[in-house]
Swiss-Prot record:
Protein's name in the database: Trimethylamine monooxygenase
Molecular-function GO terms, alphabetical: flavin adenine dinucleotide binding; N,N-dimethylaniline monooxygenase activity; NADP binding; trimethylamine monooxygenase activity
Summary of the knockout phenotype: Mutant cannot grow on TMA as a sole source of carbon and energy.
Gene giving rise to this polypeptide: tmm
Pfam families: FMO-like (PF00743)
Length: 451
Protein backbone atom coordinates (compact mmCIF):
# COMPACT_ATOMS: atom_id res chain seq x y z
CA UNK A 1 0.00 0.00 0.00
CA UNK A 2 1.14 3.56 -0.73
CA UNK A 3 2.33 5.31 2.43
CA UNK A 4 2.23 9.08 2.97
CA UNK A 5 4.06 10.91 5.76
CA UNK A 6 2.65 14.29 6.77
CA UNK A 7 4.97 16.50 8.81
CA UNK A 8 2.94 18.65 11.18
CA UNK A 9 -0.67 18.69 12.40
CA UNK A 10 -1.26 22.41 12.06
CA UNK A 11 -3.69 23.97 9.56
CA UNK A 12 -1.79 22.68 6.49
CA UNK A 13 -1.27 19.16 7.79
CA UNK A 14 -4.87 18.98 8.93
CA UNK A 15 -5.99 20.16 5.49
CA UNK A 16 -4.11 17.22 3.97
CA UNK A 17 -5.73 14.76 6.37
CA UNK A 18 -9.14 16.25 5.66
CA UNK A 19 -8.56 16.03 1.90
CA UNK A 20 -7.86 12.30 2.09
CA UNK A 21 -10.74 11.72 4.51
CA UNK A 22 -13.08 13.48 2.09
CA UNK A 23 -11.97 11.20 -0.75
CA UNK A 24 -12.32 8.12 1.43
CA UNK A 25 -15.82 9.14 2.46
CA UNK A 26 -16.75 9.25 -1.23
CA UNK A 27 -15.51 5.70 -1.76
CA UNK A 28 -11.92 6.20 -2.88
CA UNK A 29 -9.18 3.90 -1.65
CA UNK A 30 -6.80 6.15 0.26
CA UNK A 31 -3.17 5.47 1.17
CA UNK A 32 -1.82 4.74 4.63
CA UNK A 33 -1.42 8.10 6.34
CA UNK A 34 0.96 8.92 9.18
CA UNK A 35 1.06 12.47 10.50
CA UNK A 36 3.97 13.30 12.80
CA UNK A 37 3.28 16.14 15.26
CA UNK A 38 5.88 17.50 17.66
CA UNK A 39 3.32 19.00 20.03
CA UNK A 40 1.01 17.04 22.32
CA UNK A 41 -2.08 18.27 20.46
CA UNK A 42 -2.99 19.38 16.97
CA UNK A 43 -3.52 22.96 15.83
CA UNK A 44 0.05 24.04 15.08
CA UNK A 45 0.64 27.74 15.59
CA UNK A 46 -2.92 28.19 16.80
CA UNK A 47 -2.06 26.38 20.03
CA UNK A 48 -1.12 28.89 22.69
CA UNK A 49 1.76 28.06 25.02
CA UNK A 50 3.25 30.12 27.81
CA UNK A 51 6.61 28.54 27.05
CA UNK A 52 9.36 30.28 25.09
CA UNK A 53 12.73 28.96 24.00
CA UNK A 54 12.36 25.22 24.52
CA UNK A 55 9.50 22.93 25.49
CA UNK A 56 9.37 20.29 28.21
CA UNK A 57 11.49 17.95 26.06
CA UNK A 58 14.16 20.51 25.21
CA UNK A 59 12.78 20.98 21.68
CA UNK A 60 12.46 24.48 20.18
CA UNK A 61 9.03 25.92 20.97
CA UNK A 62 6.94 25.94 17.81
CA UNK A 63 4.25 28.40 18.85
CA UNK A 64 4.32 32.14 18.24
CA UNK A 65 0.83 32.84 19.58
CA UNK A 66 0.31 35.37 22.33
CA UNK A 67 -2.41 36.22 24.78
CA UNK A 68 -5.11 38.60 23.59
CA UNK A 69 -4.44 37.84 19.91
CA UNK A 70 -7.40 38.57 17.65
CA UNK A 71 -7.63 37.85 13.95
CA UNK A 72 -6.01 40.67 12.00
CA UNK A 73 -7.99 39.82 8.86
CA UNK A 74 -11.67 39.10 8.21
CA UNK A 75 -12.68 35.54 9.04
CA UNK A 76 -14.75 35.61 5.85
CA UNK A 77 -11.52 35.49 3.83
CA UNK A 78 -10.22 32.32 5.45
CA UNK A 79 -13.47 30.38 5.80
CA UNK A 80 -13.39 26.73 4.74
CA UNK A 81 -15.46 26.12 1.62
CA UNK A 82 -16.75 22.84 3.08
CA UNK A 83 -17.29 23.95 6.68
CA UNK A 84 -18.61 27.44 7.39
CA UNK A 85 -18.37 29.36 10.63
CA UNK A 86 -22.16 29.21 10.83
CA UNK A 87 -22.15 25.43 10.56
CA UNK A 88 -19.63 25.24 13.38
CA UNK A 89 -21.11 27.83 15.75
CA UNK A 90 -24.76 27.46 14.78
CA UNK A 91 -25.09 31.16 13.94
CA UNK A 92 -23.14 34.01 12.35
CA UNK A 93 -20.34 35.41 14.52
CA UNK A 94 -18.41 38.71 14.28
CA UNK A 95 -15.81 39.12 11.56
CA UNK A 96 -12.74 39.42 13.80
CA UNK A 97 -12.65 36.63 16.40
CA UNK A 98 -9.87 36.03 18.94
CA UNK A 99 -7.43 33.12 18.77
CA UNK A 100 -9.46 30.75 20.95
CA UNK A 101 -12.49 31.07 18.68
CA UNK A 102 -10.50 30.49 15.49
CA UNK A 103 -8.77 27.52 17.12
CA UNK A 104 -12.16 26.07 18.02
CA UNK A 105 -13.31 26.47 14.41
CA UNK A 106 -10.23 24.75 12.97
CA UNK A 107 -10.59 21.90 15.45
CA UNK A 108 -14.28 21.50 14.72
CA UNK A 109 -13.76 20.40 11.14
CA UNK A 110 -11.05 17.84 11.83
CA UNK A 111 -12.81 16.43 14.88
CA UNK A 112 -15.92 15.95 12.78
CA UNK A 113 -13.77 14.28 10.11
CA UNK A 114 -12.33 11.68 12.53
CA UNK A 115 -8.71 12.03 11.38
CA UNK A 116 -7.02 12.14 14.78
CA UNK A 117 -6.27 8.43 14.46
CA UNK A 118 -3.66 9.25 11.81
CA UNK A 119 -1.62 11.56 14.07
CA UNK A 120 1.34 10.48 16.20
CA UNK A 121 1.65 13.21 18.80
CA UNK A 122 4.81 14.20 20.71
CA UNK A 123 6.83 12.86 17.79
CA UNK A 124 9.47 15.08 16.22
CA UNK A 125 10.99 14.43 12.80
CA UNK A 126 14.77 14.22 12.94
CA UNK A 127 15.76 13.36 9.35
CA UNK A 128 14.31 12.63 5.93
CA UNK A 129 16.20 11.39 2.90
CA UNK A 130 15.28 9.73 -0.38
CA UNK A 131 16.62 6.55 -1.94
CA UNK A 132 16.77 6.82 -5.74
CA UNK A 133 16.95 3.04 -6.06
CA UNK A 134 13.86 2.15 -4.03
CA UNK A 135 12.10 5.47 -4.73
CA UNK A 136 11.23 5.66 -1.03
CA UNK A 137 11.75 8.26 1.68
CA UNK A 138 13.21 7.19 4.99
CA UNK A 139 11.74 9.26 7.80
CA UNK A 140 13.54 9.13 11.15
CA UNK A 141 11.58 10.44 14.12
CA UNK A 142 11.84 10.63 17.88
CA UNK A 143 9.02 9.64 20.21
CA UNK A 144 9.53 12.35 22.81
CA UNK A 145 7.59 10.62 25.57
CA UNK A 146 9.46 7.33 25.17
CA UNK A 147 12.76 9.02 24.26
CA UNK A 148 13.13 6.60 21.34
CA UNK A 149 14.31 7.04 17.75
CA UNK A 150 12.87 4.95 14.92
CA UNK A 151 12.64 5.06 11.12
CA UNK A 152 9.94 4.19 8.59
CA UNK A 153 9.72 4.35 4.81
CA UNK A 154 7.15 6.26 2.76
CA UNK A 155 6.26 6.79 -0.88
CA UNK A 156 5.40 10.46 -0.39
CA UNK A 157 6.30 13.11 2.17
CA UNK A 158 4.15 16.19 2.80
CA UNK A 159 5.99 18.98 4.61
CA UNK A 160 3.31 20.92 6.49
CA UNK A 161 5.38 22.27 9.37
CA UNK A 162 4.89 25.92 8.42
CA UNK A 163 7.37 28.77 8.24
CA UNK A 164 6.46 31.00 11.18
CA UNK A 165 8.28 29.25 14.02
CA UNK A 166 12.01 29.90 13.48
CA UNK A 167 12.67 33.60 14.13
CA UNK A 168 14.91 35.76 12.00
CA UNK A 169 16.98 37.65 14.57
CA UNK A 170 19.21 40.43 13.20
CA UNK A 171 22.02 41.99 15.22
CA UNK A 172 22.29 45.68 16.02
CA UNK A 173 25.40 47.15 17.65
CA UNK A 174 24.85 47.62 21.37
CA UNK A 175 21.87 45.29 21.62
CA UNK A 176 23.86 42.78 23.69
CA UNK A 177 24.30 45.33 26.50
CA UNK A 178 20.92 47.04 26.20
CA UNK A 179 19.70 47.38 29.82
CA UNK A 180 16.04 46.62 29.06
CA UNK A 181 14.08 43.70 27.66
CA UNK A 182 14.94 42.40 24.16
CA UNK A 183 12.79 39.75 22.50
CA UNK A 184 11.61 38.52 19.12
CA UNK A 185 7.90 38.44 18.29
CA UNK A 186 8.15 34.63 18.46
CA UNK A 187 8.66 34.95 22.23
CA UNK A 188 6.10 37.71 22.81
CA UNK A 189 3.31 36.40 25.04
CA UNK A 190 1.61 39.22 26.95
CA UNK A 191 1.20 42.95 26.27
CA UNK A 192 0.81 43.59 30.00
CA UNK A 193 4.59 43.19 30.27
CA UNK A 194 4.96 46.57 28.58
CA UNK A 195 2.40 48.67 30.45
CA UNK A 196 3.88 52.13 31.01
CA UNK A 197 6.95 51.30 28.90
CA UNK A 198 8.52 53.05 25.92
CA UNK A 199 8.64 50.26 23.34
CA UNK A 200 10.79 50.06 20.21
CA UNK A 201 9.28 47.77 17.56
CA UNK A 202 11.73 46.82 14.81
CA UNK A 203 9.90 45.73 11.66
CA UNK A 204 7.05 46.87 9.46
CA UNK A 205 4.94 43.84 8.63
CA UNK A 206 1.84 42.26 10.17
CA UNK A 207 3.40 41.15 13.46
CA UNK A 208 4.82 44.64 14.08
CA UNK A 209 1.48 46.21 13.26
CA UNK A 210 -0.52 43.83 15.45
CA UNK A 211 1.76 43.58 18.49
CA UNK A 212 2.29 47.34 18.59
CA UNK A 213 -1.48 47.91 18.43
CA UNK A 214 -2.00 45.44 21.23
CA UNK A 215 0.68 46.96 23.44
CA UNK A 216 -0.97 50.35 22.96
CA UNK A 217 -4.35 48.86 23.80
CA UNK A 218 -3.05 47.44 27.08
CA UNK A 219 -1.19 50.54 28.20
CA UNK A 220 2.28 50.98 26.69
CA UNK A 221 3.49 54.56 27.21
CA UNK A 222 4.89 55.05 23.71
CA UNK A 223 5.72 52.97 20.65
CA UNK A 224 8.47 53.71 18.14
CA UNK A 225 8.50 51.78 14.87
CA UNK A 226 11.78 51.23 13.04
CA UNK A 227 11.48 50.09 9.43
CA UNK A 228 14.03 48.83 6.91
CA UNK A 229 12.27 49.13 3.55
CA UNK A 230 8.88 50.77 3.96
CA UNK A 231 7.01 52.33 6.89
CA UNK A 232 3.64 51.29 8.25
CA UNK A 233 1.67 54.20 6.83
CA UNK A 234 -1.38 54.24 9.07
CA UNK A 235 -2.97 56.95 11.15
CA UNK A 236 -1.35 55.90 14.41
CA UNK A 237 -2.26 57.43 17.79
CA UNK A 238 -0.11 60.34 19.01
CA UNK A 239 2.15 58.16 21.16
CA UNK A 240 3.40 56.33 18.03
CA UNK A 241 6.51 57.42 16.12
CA UNK A 242 7.81 55.98 12.86
CA UNK A 243 11.59 55.95 12.29
CA UNK A 244 13.89 54.50 9.63
CA UNK A 245 16.21 51.58 10.34
CA UNK A 246 17.76 51.17 13.77
CA UNK A 247 21.56 51.51 13.50
CA UNK A 248 22.72 51.02 17.10
CA UNK A 249 21.81 51.16 20.77
CA UNK A 250 23.80 53.02 23.41
CA UNK A 251 22.35 52.38 26.83
CA UNK A 252 18.61 52.95 26.46
CA UNK A 253 19.04 55.28 23.50
CA UNK A 254 18.12 53.94 20.07
CA UNK A 255 19.84 55.56 17.10
CA UNK A 256 18.27 55.57 13.65
CA UNK A 257 19.51 55.88 10.08
CA UNK A 258 18.32 59.50 9.75
CA UNK A 259 20.36 60.57 12.80
CA UNK A 260 17.37 60.77 15.14
CA UNK A 261 17.21 59.11 18.55
CA UNK A 262 14.67 57.73 21.02
CA UNK A 263 14.94 56.54 24.61
CA UNK A 264 13.29 53.13 24.96
CA UNK A 265 12.70 50.59 27.74
CA UNK A 266 12.29 47.49 25.58
CA UNK A 267 13.12 46.28 22.07
CA UNK A 268 10.73 43.97 20.24
CA UNK A 269 12.09 42.42 17.04
CA UNK A 270 9.25 41.86 14.58
CA UNK A 271 11.77 40.87 11.94
CA UNK A 272 10.12 37.85 10.42
CA UNK A 273 10.82 34.15 10.25
CA UNK A 274 13.02 31.71 8.36
CA UNK A 275 11.99 28.80 6.17
CA UNK A 276 13.86 26.28 8.30
CA UNK A 277 13.80 22.55 7.60
CA UNK A 278 16.83 21.02 9.37
CA UNK A 279 15.25 17.57 9.13
CA UNK A 280 15.50 17.47 5.33
CA UNK A 281 18.48 16.33 3.30
CA UNK A 282 20.02 19.24 1.41
CA UNK A 283 18.72 18.09 -1.98
CA UNK A 284 15.17 18.09 -0.60
CA UNK A 285 15.26 21.33 1.37
CA UNK A 286 13.29 24.38 0.28
CA UNK A 287 15.42 27.50 0.61
CA UNK A 288 13.48 30.71 0.13
CA UNK A 289 12.52 34.01 1.63
CA UNK A 290 8.89 34.76 2.42
CA UNK A 291 7.29 35.39 -0.96
CA UNK A 292 4.10 34.69 -2.89
CA UNK A 293 5.70 32.09 -5.17
CA UNK A 294 8.81 30.28 -3.86
CA UNK A 295 11.25 28.96 -6.46
CA UNK A 296 11.45 25.23 -7.02
CA UNK A 297 7.82 24.38 -6.29
CA UNK A 298 5.52 23.32 -9.14
CA UNK A 299 2.06 24.76 -8.50
CA UNK A 300 3.62 26.15 -5.32
CA UNK A 301 3.40 22.59 -3.93
CA UNK A 302 5.63 19.95 -5.56
CA UNK A 303 9.41 19.94 -5.18
CA UNK A 304 10.63 20.31 -8.74
CA UNK A 305 13.62 17.99 -8.34
CA UNK A 306 11.48 15.27 -6.73
CA UNK A 307 7.71 15.84 -6.94
CA UNK A 308 7.04 13.01 -4.49
CA UNK A 309 8.06 15.62 -1.91
CA UNK A 310 5.20 18.03 -1.27
CA UNK A 311 5.24 21.38 0.52
CA UNK A 312 2.03 22.99 1.82
CA UNK A 313 1.53 26.59 2.92
CA UNK A 314 5.04 27.81 2.13
CA UNK A 315 3.93 31.03 0.43
CA UNK A 316 3.43 34.45 1.89
CA UNK A 317 -0.31 34.49 2.38
CA UNK A 318 -3.43 36.50 1.89
CA UNK A 319 -5.59 33.40 1.55
CA UNK A 320 -4.80 31.01 4.39
CA UNK A 321 -6.97 28.09 5.50
CA UNK A 322 -8.83 27.74 2.21
CA UNK A 323 -5.56 28.03 0.27
CA UNK A 324 -4.09 25.21 2.34
CA UNK A 325 -7.19 23.23 1.41
CA UNK A 326 -6.77 23.99 -2.30
CA UNK A 327 -3.15 22.83 -2.14
CA UNK A 328 -3.95 19.73 -0.07
CA UNK A 329 -6.76 18.63 -2.40
CA UNK A 330 -4.44 19.06 -5.39
CA UNK A 331 -1.63 17.13 -3.69
CA UNK A 332 -4.09 14.38 -2.73
CA UNK A 333 -5.27 13.97 -6.30
CA UNK A 334 -1.72 13.70 -7.59
CA UNK A 335 -1.01 10.98 -5.02
CA UNK A 336 -4.26 9.19 -5.92
CA UNK A 337 -3.38 9.34 -9.62
CA UNK A 338 -6.29 11.60 -10.51
CA UNK A 339 -3.94 14.36 -11.67
CA UNK A 340 -0.89 13.43 -13.72
CA UNK A 341 2.10 15.71 -13.26
CA UNK A 342 3.73 16.87 -16.50
CA UNK A 343 7.38 16.30 -17.38
CA UNK A 344 10.08 18.31 -15.62
CA UNK A 345 10.47 20.79 -18.50
CA UNK A 346 6.78 21.64 -18.51
CA UNK A 347 6.72 21.94 -14.72
CA UNK A 348 9.66 24.34 -14.85
CA UNK A 349 7.95 26.42 -17.52
CA UNK A 350 4.91 26.72 -15.24
CA UNK A 351 7.11 27.76 -12.30
CA UNK A 352 8.85 30.35 -14.49
CA UNK A 353 5.48 31.69 -15.64
CA UNK A 354 4.24 32.28 -12.09
CA UNK A 355 7.58 33.66 -10.94
CA UNK A 356 7.53 36.08 -13.86
CA UNK A 357 4.10 37.31 -12.83
CA UNK A 358 5.26 37.67 -9.23
CA UNK A 359 8.23 39.82 -10.28
CA UNK A 360 5.82 42.39 -11.76
CA UNK A 361 3.80 42.87 -8.57
CA UNK A 362 4.00 46.37 -7.13
CA UNK A 363 1.16 46.86 -4.65
CA UNK A 364 -0.75 44.89 -2.03
CA UNK A 365 -3.72 44.83 -4.39
CA UNK A 366 -1.48 43.26 -7.05
CA UNK A 367 -0.49 40.58 -4.55
CA UNK A 368 -4.12 39.87 -3.71
CA UNK A 369 -5.00 39.49 -7.39
CA UNK A 370 -1.97 37.24 -7.95
CA UNK A 371 -2.91 34.85 -5.16
CA UNK A 372 -6.54 34.88 -6.28
CA UNK A 373 -5.44 33.67 -9.72
CA UNK A 374 -3.25 31.06 -8.05
CA UNK A 375 -6.31 29.74 -6.22
CA UNK A 376 -8.25 29.78 -9.48
CA UNK A 377 -5.52 27.64 -11.03
CA UNK A 378 -5.73 24.95 -8.34
CA UNK A 379 -9.35 24.47 -7.29
CA UNK A 380 -11.04 23.47 -10.61
CA UNK A 381 -8.69 20.49 -10.98
CA UNK A 382 -10.15 18.85 -7.85
CA UNK A 383 -13.50 18.34 -6.13
CA UNK A 384 -12.80 21.01 -3.51
CA UNK A 385 -15.89 23.27 -3.51
CA UNK A 386 -15.32 26.33 -5.67
CA UNK A 387 -16.33 29.63 -4.09
CA UNK A 388 -16.43 33.22 -5.33
CA UNK A 389 -12.73 34.07 -5.36
CA UNK A 390 -13.36 37.54 -6.76
CA UNK A 391 -15.54 38.40 -3.77
CA UNK A 392 -12.80 37.24 -1.42
CA UNK A 393 -10.26 39.37 -3.31
CA UNK A 394 -12.57 42.38 -3.08
CA UNK A 395 -12.94 41.79 0.66
CA UNK A 396 -9.16 41.63 1.12
CA UNK A 397 -8.90 45.00 -0.62
CA UNK A 398 -11.69 46.45 1.52
CA UNK A 399 -9.81 45.21 4.60
CA UNK A 400 -6.63 46.96 3.45
CA UNK A 401 -8.61 50.19 3.01
CA UNK A 402 -10.35 49.76 6.36
CA UNK A 403 -6.96 49.65 8.09
CA UNK A 404 -5.95 52.90 6.41
CA UNK A 405 -9.19 54.50 7.64
CA UNK A 406 -8.75 53.30 11.24
CA UNK A 407 -5.89 51.05 12.27
CA UNK A 408 -7.29 50.83 15.79
CA UNK A 409 -10.92 50.44 14.75
CA UNK A 410 -10.96 48.25 11.64
CA UNK A 411 -11.70 45.12 13.68
CA UNK A 412 -15.10 46.59 14.56
CA UNK A 413 -16.28 46.20 10.95
CA UNK A 414 -18.58 43.42 9.75
CA UNK A 415 -18.63 41.62 6.42
CA UNK A 416 -20.79 39.20 4.45
CA UNK A 417 -19.76 35.53 4.36
CA UNK A 418 -18.81 34.43 0.85
CA UNK A 419 -19.86 30.89 1.78
CA UNK A 420 -23.32 31.58 3.25
CA UNK A 421 -24.27 35.09 2.11
CA UNK A 422 -25.05 36.16 5.67
CA UNK A 423 -23.55 39.27 7.24
CA UNK A 424 -21.60 38.99 10.46
CA UNK A 425 -23.10 40.73 13.49
CA UNK A 426 -21.06 43.44 15.22
CA UNK A 427 -19.15 42.30 18.25
CA UNK A 428 -20.77 43.27 21.54
CA UNK A 429 -17.64 45.23 22.54
CA UNK A 430 -15.37 47.50 20.51
CA UNK A 431 -11.97 45.89 19.93
CA UNK A 432 -10.11 48.60 21.84
CA UNK A 433 -12.36 47.96 24.84
CA UNK A 434 -12.41 44.14 24.60
CA UNK A 435 -9.70 43.18 27.08
CA UNK A 436 -10.87 39.59 27.59
CA UNK A 437 -10.05 37.39 24.58
CA UNK A 438 -11.52 34.18 25.97
CA UNK A 439 -13.96 32.02 24.03
CA UNK A 440 -16.74 32.64 26.55
CA UNK A 441 -16.25 36.40 26.61
CA UNK A 442 -16.42 36.58 22.82
CA UNK A 443 -19.54 34.44 22.56
CA UNK A 444 -21.41 36.21 25.36
CA UNK A 445 -21.91 39.78 26.46
CA UNK A 446 -19.56 40.74 29.33
CA UNK A 447 -22.23 40.50 32.01
CA UNK A 448 -23.22 37.01 30.80
CA UNK A 449 -19.62 35.78 30.65
CA UNK A 450 -19.03 36.89 34.23
CA UNK A 451 -21.93 34.87 35.62
Amino acid sequence: MTRVAIIGAGPSGLAQLRAFQSAGKKGAAIPELVCFEKQSDWGGLWNYTWRTGVDEYGEPVHGSMYRYLWSNGPKECLEFADYSFEEHFGRPIPSYPPRAVLHDYIMGRVEKSDVRKFVRFSTVVRWIDFDETTQLFTVTVKDLKKDELYSETFDYVVVASGHFSTPNVPHFPGIEVFPGRVLHAHDFRDANEFVGKNLLVVGSSYSAEDIASQCYKYGAKSITFSYRSKPLNFDWPECFTVKPLLTKLTGKTAHFKDGSEAVVDAVLLCTGYLHHFPFLADNLRLKTNNRLYPAGLYKGIFWQDNPKLIYLGMQDQYFTFNMFDAQAWYARDVILGRIKLPAAEERQADIDHWRGLEEKLETAFDGIDFQTEYMRDLIPATDYPMFDLDKVAALFKEWEEDKVKSIMGYRDNSYVSIMTGNKAPPHHTKWMEALDDSFDAFQNRPEAAAE
